[in-house]
Amino acid sequence: MSQFADFYQLIAKSPLSHWLNTLPAQLSEWEQTSQHCKFSQWFNAVERLPMLTPARLDLLHGVEADCDPPLSAGQQAGIESLLRQLMPWRKGPFSLYGVSIDTEWRSDWKWERVLPHIAPLAGRLILDVGCGSGYHLWRMVGAGAQLAVGIDPMQLFYCQFAAVRKLLGGDQRAHLLPLGIEQLPALAAFDTVFSMGVLYHRRSPLDHLLQLKNQLVSGGELVLETLVIEGDSQQVLVPGERYAQMRNVYFIPSATALVSWLEKCGFVNVRHVDMSVTSTDEQRRTAWMTSESLADFLHSDDPRLTVEGHPAPLRAVIVAEKH
């Protein structure tokens, strides 16, 4: 049986039911095609994790689960060992039965910046594009979402999400599908669509904005979080081969240019609601992500610049609505 069978059953009587015309074939192909060379190792680690039902689950203030009585030190060590097989952990943090996953990013800080500015998520059907490990999916559930669906083609992120969900008792309020946005039909079914940390990786940013729009119901809300630069509506940075050591960065607009792009794509009530400089406290090397991080990507003599001489990472949150 497909590992996505529960999701198919869940959406069969929802506004997403028409997705069943294409989705099962896509995911069946994914299950049958050659996977990343480490996928079987990652998936085996997930399979070996216990299915635990938390006695205490806090998704409102973080992603934290505990049981009563607490797990023994040996049980905790066994879970931690399996979770470490899924390194690097980039988006979090998680606190699961005494095991603290200190991820590269303090994704909870981003959530705290975003949440005050968006429509309440209670009862909403939500799509999170490029969701990574799924950390924000759980925070969306904690904020009252009816269903939070994440898409991300990275197989490690799929396994990380599956591991966390297994430790949360197989919670069906959040699902991650190993797909890219370009594989989705125009569903026009989600009340809120998030795209956080994705736009600058797209060769055609306006096409990405239109793809996001196509997933929203009329009156639905887009929450866009992305790199920006200082400047007026005409300012867009097109980095050379790399930006902060990343190869796949194509366009970094000013916040005002980004607002113009959204309006050009037909969004209404476009608001620039937050701007923050990424600090080395928010993105850093940890015991769960041991390779280079932001401190290694900034200019040694001037942290206002990347190693390539571009402006250092500055992130904006833009909120808009589909007419």
From Swiss-Prot:
GO MF, any single term: methyltransferase activity
Transmembrane domains' residue ranges: none
Binding site for carboxy-S-adenosyl-L-methionine: K91, W105, K110, G130, I181, E182, M196, Y200, R315
Keywords: Transferase, tRNA processing
EC number: 2.5.1.-
InterPro entries recorded: CmoB, Mo5U34_MeTrfas-like, SAM-dependent_MTases_sf
Enzyme class of the recorded protein, top EC level: transferase
Functional summary from the UniProt entry: Catalyzes carboxymethyl transfer from carboxy-S-adenosyl-L-methionine (Cx-SAM) to 5-hydroxyuridine (ho5U) to form 5-carboxymethoxyuridine (cmo5U) at position 34 in tRNAs.
Protein name (record): tRNA U34 carboxymethyltransferase
Gene: cmoB
